[in-house]
Curated annotation (Swiss-Prot):
Belongs to the ATPase delta chain family. F(1)F(0) ATP synthase produces ATP from ADP in the presence of a proton or sodium gradient. F-type ATPases consist of two structural domains, F(1) containing the extramembraneous catalytic core and F(0) containing the membrane proton channel, linked together by a central stalk and a peripheral stalk. During catalysis, ATP synthesis in the catalytic domain of F(1) is coupled via a rotary mechanism of the central stalk subunits to proton translocation. It is a peripheral membrane protein. F-type ATPases have 2 components, F(1) - the catalytic core - and F(0) - the membrane proton channel. F(1) has five subunits: alpha(3), beta(3), gamma(1), delta(1), epsilon(1). F(0) has three main subunits: a(1), b(2) and c(10-14). The alpha and beta chains form an alternating ring which encloses part of the gamma chain. F(1) is attached to F(0) by a central stalk formed by the gamma and epsilon chains, while a peripheral stalk is formed by the delta and b chains. Keywords: ATP synthesis, Cell membrane, CF(1), Hydrogen ion transport, Ion transport, Membrane, Transport. Coiled coil: none annotated. This is ATP synthase subunit delta. It comes from Mesomycoplasma hyopneumoniae (strain J / ATCC 25934 / NCTC 10110). It is found in: Cell membrane. GO terms for molecular function: proton-transporting ATP synthase activity, rotational mechanism. Pfam families: OSCP. Disulfide bonds: none annotated.
């Protein structure tokens, strides 16, 4: 497993070198998020690209059909290389490692803002600004609707969770009630 880990980190580092040399790091980050989203929403693609019953050229044609008009040509070719080398199973780790390296290069980070309802881009920008000051680096947020929140927001940046929602309040209340019941039963 370590050998594969080293390999796919090498792929991410190579992609970073290319994006830096092309002065296109930010565009590649956005394209990587797009790729992750497409494959996440179409899990059958993973099975297709890791299958030994489908020829390499057929896989390349599928990659072209899905991605050619939407992302940089270098990234299309990059996907073909990992498919050719039977590393498509690790596409997510490779792309996430690239995003992490690229963010470090740009002194920025990405996070997710979850709400129970749609919010404006102005509000998202406001949260980005506040978090950028708090964390000391540029923060970009991607919006996601999470119906479990009921109301309020949850922001996740660099494994830190900033939350103010009815869901978190109910969860805390439930924990306190359990704790209270356990203590009462011990008496």
């Amino acid at each position: 497993m370590y050998l594969y880990k080293k390999n796919y980190y090498g792929y991410a580092e190579s992609l970073l070198d290319i994006s830096i040399s092309e002065n296109n790091v930010e565009k590649y980050i956005n394209d990587c998020f797009f790729i992750l989203s497409i494959i996440q929403n179409n899990q059958v693609l993973i099975l297709l690209f890791k299958s030994h019953f489908i020829g390499k050229q057929e896989k390349f044609n599928i990659i072209d059909k899905i991605f050619s008009a939407k992302i940089e040509k270098i990234l299309v070719n990059f996907l073909k290389v990992i498919a050719k080398n039977n590393l498509f199973l690790y596409y997510k780790q490779i792309l996430l490692k690239y995003i992490k390296l690229a963010n470090s290069h740009l002194s920025q980070t990405w996070g997710e803002i979850e709400t129970a309802f749609p919010i404006s881009s102005v509000m998202t920008s406001s949260f980005e600004s506040i978090l950028s000051k708090k964390l000391g680096k540029k923060v970009h947020l991607r919006h996601k609707i999470n119906s479990k929140l009921i109301s309020g927001i949850r922001i996740i940046v660099d494994n830190q969770i900033f939350e103010n929602s009815l869901f978190s309040e109910l969860k805390l209340l439930k924990q306190n009630l359990k704790k209270h019941l356990i203590t009462k039963n011990d008496l």
